[in-house]
Amino acid sequence: MNQLDQYSQPMQHLILLWFWLLDLSPPPSFHLSVKSVDLSLFSLSPLFLLLSISSLIFSRVNKFGIRRVGYAMAPKPDPTVLPDLQEKKAILGTQIEMITQAMTTLESRVTDLQQESNDHRTWVREALDKLLKRDLGDENRPKPTTNKMIATGEQHKGEVSTSLFHD
């Protein structure tokens, strides 16, 4: 078995691959002309062959618009669109600033309303205390019943006892 017969079938596929990668159409009698190719160069340096095929594959892949590894996948911006984007960015920036100012104003207003509410509660409490003191007076104001009073059955003057120990 000679070297030509040993490599003829794989070389035929390899040469067809090269034709495909180079966008060439093979000659009509390609299967007959493969045996006449000198294989000494290919048999002596398979690394060279592998490198040349891989570079051809990458160049073929790039013809289809697929980017190589390491390149950015994002498309380049259109220069006509860029001013519009910058204008929109400026508009959004001013809108964000206005919203931030409105939120600050609302927060300060909420704080003011809480303080007013606390002031009103205090005022209502004080007013009710004044009304109770004025209407009842200190002597007519009901005094709290203590546990000691309940236990001894003691009553306040003019009050009905609700004690269980009533005589």
Curated annotation (Swiss-Prot):
TM annotation in the entry: 39-59
GO CC annotation: mitochondrial membrane
Residue ranges of the region described as Disordered: 134-167
Keyword annotations of the record: Coiled coil, Membrane, Mitochondrion, Transmembrane, Transmembrane helix
Coiled coil is among the record's keywords: yes
Biased composition (Basic and acidic residues): 154-167
Subcellular location: Mitochondrion membrane
Main location as per UniProt: mitochondrion
Residue ranges the record marks as coiled coil: 92-122
Bilayer topology term: Single-pass membrane protein
Protein name in the entry: Uncharacterized mitochondrial protein AtMg00140
Source organism of this protein record: Arabidopsis thaliana
Lineage: Eukaryota, Viridiplantae, Streptophyta, Embryophyta, Tracheophyta
